[in-house]
């Protein structure tokens, strides 16, 4: 898969774009996005539209820039199709899908931010400066891989997510800003995420700007039903 078309690969980088979106009668959700990924002093820019089908628990990402690409996300499988090159890849992940803003949509319709479904448990909570912080511990068998998750929310809106190792080292952090009302929920229209090396050195920085949110609006081109053409050979990749 071309490097300039990869979405950031980062375990547990972020969990939600919508706080308790399941409170609204969600059937479909579409968002335009512009994404910047900075790594090693180089910035890649990607733009397109993300579609979520709640009933099918399926995400379709249409990338329009820099090159055309269609990504299909369902369960622990991600399929990527390049229509111009007529190539396709299928990635199967053991744990969470390491695609920050795609994963956040998938988890948005689940209680407890989807953490309990993969074995996380609420350890404790605290309130500081009107922000509610909840601390989530991973299942024992996955502590070395997943790390502790700390979520911050204010007025029912998710504003931050952090991942720390068992010894307290910060490995990832996401901030949610510019919330807008959609149905019964507030959607952050800007999400920034950082991956860290040891000593808090930033390894990778990602900024995503969302626009034109559409709730329960059927996309005109039936993209939600898209399947990779049967004539295309799909290369299998285990992650």
Residue spans of the language-model regions?
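Bacterial N-terminal signal peptides that target proteins for export
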Residues: 1-9
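Hydrophobic lipid-interacting interfaces of membrane-associated proteins
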Residues: 34-38, 64-66, 81, 85, ...
């Amino acid at each position: 898969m071309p490097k300039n078309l990869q979405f950031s690969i980062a375990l547990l980088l972020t969990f939600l774009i919508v706080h308790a979106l399941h409170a609204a009668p969600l059937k479909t959700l579409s968002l335009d996005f512009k994404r910047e990924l900075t790594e090693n002093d180089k910035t890649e820019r990607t733009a397109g539209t993300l579609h979520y089908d709640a009933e099918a628990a399926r995400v379709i990402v249409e990338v329009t820039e820099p090159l055309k690409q269609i990504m299909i996300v369902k369960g622990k499988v991600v399929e990527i199709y390049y229509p111009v090159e007529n190539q396709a890849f299928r990635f199967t992940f053991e744990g969470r899908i390491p695609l920050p803003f795609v994963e956040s949509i998938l988890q948005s319709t689940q209680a407890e931010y989807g953490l309990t479904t993969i074995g996380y448990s609420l350890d404790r909570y605290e309130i500081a400066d009107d922000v509610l912080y909840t601390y989530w511990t991973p299942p024992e068998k996955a502590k070395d891989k997943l790390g502790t998750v700390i979520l911050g929310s204010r007025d029912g809106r998710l504003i931050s997510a952090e991942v720390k190792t068992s010894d307290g080292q910060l490995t990832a952090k996401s901030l949610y800003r510019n919330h807008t009302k959609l149905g019964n929920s507030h959607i952050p229209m800007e999400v920034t995420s950082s991956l860290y090396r040891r000593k808090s050195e930033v390894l990778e920085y990602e900024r995503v700007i969302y626009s034109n949110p559409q709730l329960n609006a059927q996309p005109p081109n039936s993209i939600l039903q898209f399947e990779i053409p049967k004539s295309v050979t799909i290369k299998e990749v285990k992650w």
